Amino acid sequence: ILGVSIYLITFAWQPLCAASQSQKLLIINSYNESAPWVQNYITQYLIEAANTENLDYDLVHMNAILIQTDSLYNLVKEQIFNRFKNNKPDYLILFGRMAFSLRDQIKNEWGDVPMLFIGANDNIVLNEKYLSGNKITASATKIHLSDIREQYNFTYIEVPELYKETIDMMVRMQPDMKKLVFASDNLAGNMELNEKIKAYLTLEYPLLEYEWLVASENSRKNIQTYLISSDQSVGILLGSWYYSRPSAFGYPMLVTGDFKLIASSPRPIFSLKEKYLESGGAT
């Protein structure tokens, strides 16, 4: 997937080599800057951009896990468009559905800019901001991206979360498993994934107990207890695990290190993306 997306981007940039005027690439990341799987893509794109003549680039992290209200969403959106008001991008790479939710304002303010949208789902909720912690998003009516294909100049690349295949593998590799724990934060995508996992377990493994452990200051000890335990009756499925807490100055501080215990865990840990495990953390 990474190779294909880099090829598409490189192909799109080829005419720039002959252009005399510098053009601009903007990457808007829904997640935070330390998200492992996203950073893997971003790093490669920035390398390609740096090696492309007449192409400047910039990067914005929306930090979706901190955006739980309309007012915060609107503030971040306003800051993005104000920042590039006099320096409009010629190309866009959008990671995640929160970034893609900016598409109407992108078209209105920046024109019909070519967009590469990278996400885990090929469906969206119209007029949805994908606020973290919003329970409505998971059950809202969705449309396929093909339904809006003619309205926007975008190419979609899916980075799938293979939850069904991963759960099947967990059952095979941990035959004594009686309980599955999905450990994640409350990003909109994880809230939707929680519902999908519950439905799949009900259908395929109705005797398997299920717990969705949501990242927070209060659940920190819970996940640490699971990680240091060798109890084979409990299977751990790792999603992204970020949350905020007040800093010494009273401002929200993003907590990212709880999953560093993975490296010393005596139990097998399963993940929806390999980069979670390579970094000892998650998106």
Predicted regions span which residues?
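Bacterial N-terminal signal peptides
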Residues: L2-A12
